[in-house]
Amino acid sequence: MKHSKKIVTALLALAMSQTVMAAPVALDRVSVQINDGIILESEIGNMLATVRANANKSNQTLPSEQALRTQVIERLILTRLQLQMAERIGLQIGDLQLDQTIESIAKDQKLTVSQLQQQLENDGLSFSQYREQLREEITLGEIQRIQVQRRIQVSPQEISGLVKLMQEQGLKEVEFQIGHILIDVPSEPSSEQLEASSKRANIVLKRLNEGEDFRSTAIASSSGPKALEGGIWDYMNINEMPTLFAEVVNGAKVGDIIGPIKSGSGFHIIKVMDARGLQTKEVEEVKSRHILLKPSPILSEERAKAMLVNFQKQILSGEADFAELARQYSEDPGSAAKGGELGWSSPDVYVPEFAQTLNSLKENEMSEPFRTTHGWHLTQLMDKRKTDATEQFNSNRAHQLIFRRKFNEELQAWLDEMRSDAYIEVFEPEVNRG
């Protein structure tokens, strides 16, 4: 599960921060100012320690200390800008939602929350720090979804066009793991700046062709969004990857290095790291219903959850009917009139918490109240079925592929816009700002 993968990163980051805190340290100082916010030297040090630990674990060579520090500062700047945006729009991840996420993580690990906490403490980790790091991860995911999703439109013509293309390609599709290095150029660059960036890109390409490690080179040289991950993008189908990638990867072989490719953001170097065939299988669809309560100034988080707990008791005891409660109380206008019924669909069309809950239920089983970005839910899995890749499924899949591609492109555009509009000042290590 997605949260299961994140826990490893979170644990490692916490281990490093504990190590730093345990040793005597010099007085902390401001290293970066971002609008009205700051990044402390200790934050940079903690992330540097985490990156080094990850590199040691995977036997990965790292670039020079200065190059690594630059990448870490850039990552922290983008993170802080997103958190500032979340604060401006009033986005907060409450303790109840955080508790629910931790319960899901523990369940994925086949642990209770107490066992998870004990496991963290046995490793010398602070459970409170782990909670706050997780809160930040959820906040970043939510602010990206809120701000980027509204920039994306997927037209019926795009969907039908991709469905037709997928049918022409047949079922033997391929997913690619892409390596990406971006040598950026300033906004409105001069001809001299363009030439300098072009030369840098060609030097990087020459080193790669001579056998230099791609991941180390990306960490040292790239200004792309995945630089700290060695420039590696996870497996993507041609139809969901950013357009720039798709245009050059189609027909390429594993190991091919392509570039430099010029775009508005700079010069790109792309390497096909790996490729694999998509596994074709039957699709499981679920029929479900739910009751949604949305917290507000009038309805608190605690009250919304308590109401659903009471509904659950009434339904289980036979005092109330799920459909009638949904019609009377649910704040989902699309399903309330139908007794909360959502119809048949693949679980992955829903937000992750809802999909995860549906996947954990047996037929006719009702969930405990749980929180998503939409509010508090009580859901029941009514039925399951296996289906072939029907026309509707192909349309849904085409929509998802197009949406993911546009999301990746728009996310980077949004981050670039925020960064260019922000006041950012980086203070050199030797400058003491008291």
Swiss-Prot record:
Keywords carried by this UniProt record: Chaperone, Isomerase, Periplasm, Repeat, Rotamase, Signal
Reaction(s) the record says it catalyses: [protein]-peptidylproline (omega=180) = [protein]-peptidylproline (omega=0)
GO terms for MF: peptide binding; peptidyl-prolyl cis-trans isomerase activity; unfolded protein binding
Matches recorded under SUPFAM superfamilies: FKBP-like (SSF54534), Triger factor/SurA peptide-binding domain-like (SSF109998)
Cellular-component GO terms for this entry: outer membrane-bounded periplasmic space
Pfam families xref list: Rotamase, SurA_N
Cross-referenced HAMAP family: Chaperone_SurA
PANTHER family reported for this sequence: CHAPERONE SURA
Protein name: Chaperone SurA
Origin species: Shewanella denitrificans (strain OS217 / ATCC BAA-1090 / DSM 15013)
